[in-house]
UniProtKB/Swiss-Prot annotation:
Keywords: Aminoacyl-tRNA synthetase, ATP-binding, Cytoplasm, Ligase, Nucleotide-binding, Protein biosynthesis. It comes from the Bacteria. It is an enzyme of class 6 (ligase). The keyword Cell division does not apply. The gene is argS. A motif ('HIGH' region) lies at residues 125-135. PANTHER family: ARGININE--TRNA LIGASE, CYTOPLASMIC, ARGINYL-TRNA SYNTHETASE. It catalyses: tRNA(Arg) + L-arginine + ATP = L-arginyl-tRNA(Arg) + AMP + diphosphate. This is Arginine--tRNA ligase. Signal peptide: none annotated.
Length: 597
């Protein structure tokens, strides 16, 4: 039983005994005692002054005396201006640690058969280039969010919508056709997504050269762009694709498959995956159908040029284009089509879209449209909106080939982690295979943690050098502390020490030890809160605070060399449960922790 619940029950009994009044539990406010005061939990007594008919200090004193006499969990109390600070007894903290120790998945709630089904969409790549740093933030947030939502007792379906059609895809295809000379991933030794990305860059280079040439001949920039033979060929290719031209479709299929093989490798290395992948080429026609259905029902209207619009002025928005005059779709149409397919595939209770904050308006509109079209979860659609990520050098552009690829970034992080770990002697005594694995775990952990510790809504700068630091609020610092605890536990096991189910309760704990148990116990509430707020950063920063406190404890107290056997057992058990919570917390973020370092 939570200590807070135990104390609330006793406070209710005390108010009845002292003042003859029944008080609902919701009226009893307990909060953590401020650091500058003595105690663990503080009771706010102001709501009880009417029934006590006394001043705040006297009321607090009377309730404190009652609790000290009748509730074994209260060892002492003090009163500061109507706030009753309660010190929890050591035996109660030890009892709480026993409960946490008995639960291997402490803080994690499993879904039962009646649990709500939450679908989370993330990644959403284009098939004309590799995944880049922006996708890294998206994938890491989406994956962590899925884990956190699942840890709160929900069923989760992780889904991806691949943007596999459109003019941008045709640009890569046309460039390969013109300049590729039959090059393949096998013949070039390149990953398929990188090879296709090279041709996207090549298209842009040739297109810019054409435009410059036409401008030299006296055309304006707009005229030159409209007259570019290369761009017109790309547009023709798109028309052929839409018409199902067998040659264009075969080329599209071949190049997309190269990209998917490359994506799979990147996702695997990053440690993210999906339960279901949707492709825009399958969903955009469904969207058109649904829009036409909405038009028939009078939800939408048609303009003279044949384009279909939604009038959202009643919702405080404007008119939104859903189908162009020539019948071609826009992004909104595709999202409606994807929603239709998903709703047919799964009984979705909630839909979360992990998409950058530049799309805030888009999802505001989508929510209204889905609701109009009869999707039950339309109104409660969640846009998990996150900020942009940059490197210290500045922004990224993929058309010009100056983008930071996810593969290159991960490889660089792993190489830097290896170098740094070797310099600090963290890999001493390990085999080559073990050292490589540690470098992978530390490098990717540094990347993931640095991105996930930041509030998702904020823009951020990812600093690779800063992220691989074994001190401070970083992944490697947390991983090293975990490995340090595992080393303590191994030595304890080698000495034949076994943690009992029930620890001796006859020891006096230090303030630091009580504080650590309180922090470990908080993990369950932190997971709940992260689920309510959709906040991976809440978990990340909690884990950092916990290991920072543990490191101080490790420095100031003997563990294995402690002479009192009961105290030694307690400290080993405390260390084991801190390691467990660190592993579970980092696991929710998709970060591995090494057993040794």
């Amino acid at each position: 039983m939570k200590i807070e619940d135990k104390l609330v029950t006793s406070v209710i009994s005390g108010l009845k005994a002292l003042y003859g009044q029944d008080v609902p539990a919701a009226q009893v406010q307990l909060q953590k005692t401020k650091k500058e005061f003595e105690g663990h939990l503080t009771l706010v007594v102001f709501p009880f002054l009417k029934m006590s008919k006394k001043g705040p200090e006297q009321t607090a004193q009377e309730i404190g005396e009652y609790l000290k006499a009748n509730e074994p969990a209260v060892a002492a109390f003090n009163v500061i201006k109507g706030f009753l600070n309660l010190t929890v007894a050591s035996a109660t903290w030890i009892e709480l640690l026993n409960e946490i120790h008995a639960d291997a998945q402490y803080g994690i709630v499993s879904a039962d058969e009646n649990a709500p089904l939450v679908m989370i969409e993330y990644s959403s790549p284009n098939t004309n280039k590799p995944l880049h740093l922006g996708h890294v933030r998206n994938n890491l947030l989406g994956n962590a969010l899925a884990n956190i939502v699942m840890a709160n007792g929900n069923k989760v379906v992780k889904t991806n919508i691949v943007n596999d059609r459109g003019i941008h895809i045709c640009k890569s295809m046309l460039a390969w056709q013109k300049y590729g000379k039959g090059e393949t991933p096998e013949s070039s030794g390149k990953k398929g997504d990188h090879l296709v990305g090279d041709y996207y860059v090549a298209f842009d280079k040739h297109y810019k050269a054409e435009v410059a040439e036409l401008m030299e001949k006296g055309m304006s920039k707009e005229e030159a762009e409209a007259a570019s033979p290369l761009m017109n060929e790309a547009r023709e290719m798109l028309v052929k694709w839409e018409a199902g031209d067998p040659e264009v479709r075969a080329l599209w299929q071949m190049m997309n498959n190269w990209v998917y093989t490359g994506f799979d490798e990147t996702y695997r290395k990053m440690g993210v995956g999906f339960d279901k992948i949707y492709y825009e080429s399958n969903t955009y026609l469904e969207g058109k159908e649904k829009v036409m259905e909405g038009l028939e029902k009078g939800f939408f209207f048609k303009k003279e040029d044949g384009s279909v619009w939604a009038d959202l002025t009643a919702e405080g928005l404007d008119h939104k284009l859903l189908l162009r005059g020539d019948g071609t779709s826009v992004y909104m149409t595709q999202d409606i089509g994807t929603a239709k397919l998903r709703f047919a595939d799964y009984p979705i209770d909630k839909m979360i879209y992990v998409v950058g904050n530049e799309q805030n308006y888009h999802f505001q509109v989508l929510s209204i449209l889905l609701d109009k079209l009869g999707f039950e979860w339309g109104k409660s659609l969640v846009h998990f909106s996150y900020g942009m990520v940059e490197l210290p050098e500045g922004k990224m552009k993929s058309r010009e080939g100056t983008v930071v690829d996810a593969d290159d970034l991960m490889a660089e992080m792993i190489a830097t982690a290896k170098e740094t770990s070797q310099e600090l002697g963290k890999l001493d005594g390990l085999t080559q295979e073990e050292a490589d694995d540690i470098a992978r775990i530390v490098g990717l952990g540094a990347l993931k943690y640095f991105i996930l510790k930041v509030d998702a809504r904020k823009n951020m700068t990812f600093n690779p050098k800063e992220s691989i630091d074994f001190n401070g609020n970083t992944g490697p610092f947390i991983q090293y502390t975990y490995a340090r605890i595992r080393s303590v536990l191994r030595k304890a096991a080698e000495a034949g020490i076994v943690i009992p189910e029930v620890l001796p309760a006859n020891i006096e704990l230090s303030e630091k030890e009580e504080g650590l148990i309180q922090m470990v116990a908080d993990f369950a509430a932190v997971v709940r809160q992260a689920g309510e707020d959709y906040s991976p950063s809440g978990i990340a920063n909690y884990v950092y605070d916990l290991v920072k406190e543990y490191n101080q404890f490790y420095h100031d107290f003997s563990i294995l060399r402690e002479e009192n056997e009961d105290v030694k057992l307690f400290r080993i058990a405390l260390s084991a449960n801190i390691a467990k919570v660190v592993r579970l917390g980092m696991g929710l973020l998709g970060i591995e922790v090494p057993d040794r370092m």
